[in-house]
Amino acid sequence: MRRTFFKSKIHRATVTHADLDYEGSVSIDEDLLDASGILEYEAVHVWNITRGTRLQTYAIKGERGSGVICINGAAAHLNKPGDLVILATFAELDEAEARGFKPTVVLVDRKNKIVESDAVEIAGPARRVSA
């Protein structure tokens, strides 16, 4: 049996652009894609911390080193520049794969520069705040 597991996330990224007229997707700085292991065209969940909205789209490469997080298409109605978001992916794993699997968590600052790229999830009331 295969199960769905959390694979990777970019935590508390800042939306830099929202382009209503683009076809869709989320443009993500290529440095962040590399650090998180998110591939171009991979399904990505966008959880907006600022507005409480959630949606699913797909990733496309943004300019390397730019810090870009651009929400494209109709999703631009739900995400605006300056909003904080979590970008997350999931993977289907069988039990043997899942036993040793650890997700990738990338922490970024307010300019979407990598602060930590092998972060450990903090459970419960402990709180992590980006610089």
UniProtKB/Swiss-Prot annotation:
Family the entry assigns: Belongs to the PanD family.
Catalysed conversion reaction: L-aspartate + H(+) = beta-alanine + CO2
Coiled coil: none
Post-translational modification: Is synthesized initially as an inactive proenzyme, which is activated by self-cleavage at a specific serine bond to produce a beta-subunit with a hydroxyl group at its C-terminus and an alpha-subunit with a pyruvoyl group at its N-terminus.
Enzyme type, top EC level: lyase
Cofactor: pyruvate
Binding of substrate, residues: T57, G73, A74, A75
EC number: 4.1.1.11
Organism: Anaeromyxobacter sp. (strain Fw109-5)
Active site as annotated: S25, Y58
Modified residues (Pyruvic acid (Ser)): S25
Pfam families reported in the protein's UniProt record: Asp_decarbox (PF02261)
Quaternary structure annotation from Swiss-Prot or TrEMBL: Heterooctamer of four alpha and four beta subunits.
InterPro entries hit by this protein: Asp_de-COase-like_dom_sf, Asp_decarbox
Cell location: Cytoplasm
Single GO BP term: pantothenate biosynthetic process
Cofactor: how and how many bound: Binds 1 pyruvoyl group covalently per subunit.
GO cellular component: cytosol
Protein name as annotated: Aspartate 1-decarboxylase
UniProt-recorded Gene Ontology molecular function terms: aspartate 1-decarboxylase activity
Function in brief: Catalyzes the pyruvoyl-dependent decarboxylation of aspartate to produce beta-alanine.
Keywords: Autocatalytic cleavage, Cytoplasm, Decarboxylase, Lyase, Pantothenate biosynthesis, Pyruvate, Schiff base, Zymogen
Pathway connected to this protein: Cofactor biosynthesis; (R)-pantothenate biosynthesis; beta-alanine from L-aspartate: step 1/1
